[in-house]
């Protein structure tokens, strides 16, 4: 099954400026992401950026890069521009991989693409992993997802969902049974035609409250299929501390 990977990459980051080009084990972070995406078996891997510094960095290691508008407010809008530039067919599967995931397993990139290809009821698919640390349930940086019996998302939230009324009180938990909780992984597969529709929708109130773009899909009545990832990726890199941990993990810190 053929699919395309698009990696949106911005130079400007409030917490870690220039992070796509941050060195990890002698390579820029974005190169690690590209190489893992290529190892997934994708037909094409494209970095989408609005910054010449990132373009030049990708050119140096021979990756494919597309320049996109600096007016985009989200990675999905940047993805949509790439879809138009490539003139992808409506049913072409496109996987959006975050540019700050240098250790993302290639296997789960392929998994989310295959998952969408096998879905007839959803135009979009993503992944989650079980939460094993109760503290993550209350961490707003850990996005939780609840699904129905068939694996379709009911809701994504930074809050503790579902709420365990037997064991939760305000902001802490005791004797939590974590088996009911899943952490959302920020990797998505879409059908190209759906992305074209998505960017025409106005941002939804719940999306703006939670600052979770995927809630726009549920708000407008579409479905997102969520599968359990076959491998749990390391968390992405957002801060200098994250970067130092990544360097140690890569053996150069």
Swiss-Prot record:
GO terms for biological process: CMP-keto-3-deoxy-D-manno-octulosonic acid biosynthetic process; lipopolysaccharide biosynthetic process. It catalyses: 3-deoxy-alpha-D-manno-oct-2-ulosonate + CTP = CMP-3-deoxy-beta-D-manno-octulosonate + diphosphate. Pfam families: CTP_transf_3 (PF02348). One of its GO terms (cellular component) is cytosol. It is an enzyme of class 2 (transferase). Its EC number is 2.7.7.38. Pathway: Nucleotide-sugar biosynthesis; CMP-3-deoxy-D-manno-octulosonate biosynthesis; CMP-3-deoxy-D-manno-octulosonate from 3-deoxy-D-manno-octulosonate and CTP: step 1/1; Bacterial outer membrane biogenesis; lipopolysaccharide biosynthesis. Keywords: Cytoplasm, Lipopolysaccharide biosynthesis, Nucleotidyltransferase, Transferase. GO terms for molecular function: 3-deoxy-manno-octulosonate cytidylyltransferase activity. It is found in: Cytoplasm. Belongs to the KdsB family. Activates KDO (a required 8-carbon sugar) for incorporation into bacterial lipopolysaccharide in Gram-negative bacteria. This is 3-deoxy-manno-octulosonate cytidylyltransferase.
């Amino acid at each position: 099954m053929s699919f395309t990977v698009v990696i949106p990459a911005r130079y400007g980051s409030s917490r870690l400026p220039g992070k796509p080009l941050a060195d990890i084990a002698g390579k820029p972070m974005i190169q690690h992401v590209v190489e893992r995406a290529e190892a997934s078996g994708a037909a094409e891997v494209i970095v989408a950026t609005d910054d010449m510094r990132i373009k030049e960095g990708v050119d140096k290691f021979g990756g494919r890069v597309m320049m996109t508008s600096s007016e985009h407010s989200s990675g999905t809008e940047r993805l949509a521009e790439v879809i138009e530039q490539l003139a992808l067919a409506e049913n072409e599967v496109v996987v959006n991989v975050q540019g700050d995931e240098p250790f993302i397993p290639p296997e789960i990139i392929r998994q989310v693409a295959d998952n969408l290809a096998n879905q007839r009821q959803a135009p979009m698919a993503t992944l989650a992993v079980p939460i094993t640390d109760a503290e993550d349930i209350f961490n707003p940086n850990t996005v939780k997802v609840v699904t129905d019996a068939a694996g379709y998302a009911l809701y994504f939230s930074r809050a503790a969902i579902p709420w365990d009324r037997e064991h939760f009180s305000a902001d802490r938990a005791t004797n939590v049974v974590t088996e009911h909780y899943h952490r959302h992984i920020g990797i998505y597969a879409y059908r190209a035609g759906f992305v074209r529709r998505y960017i025409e929708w106005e941002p939804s109130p719940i999306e703006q409250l939670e600052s979770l773009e995927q809630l726009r899909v549920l708000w407008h009545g579409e479905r997102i299929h969520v599968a359990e990832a076959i491998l749990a990726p390391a968390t992405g890199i957002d801060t200098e501390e994250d970067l130092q941990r990544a360097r140690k993990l890569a053996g150069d810190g």
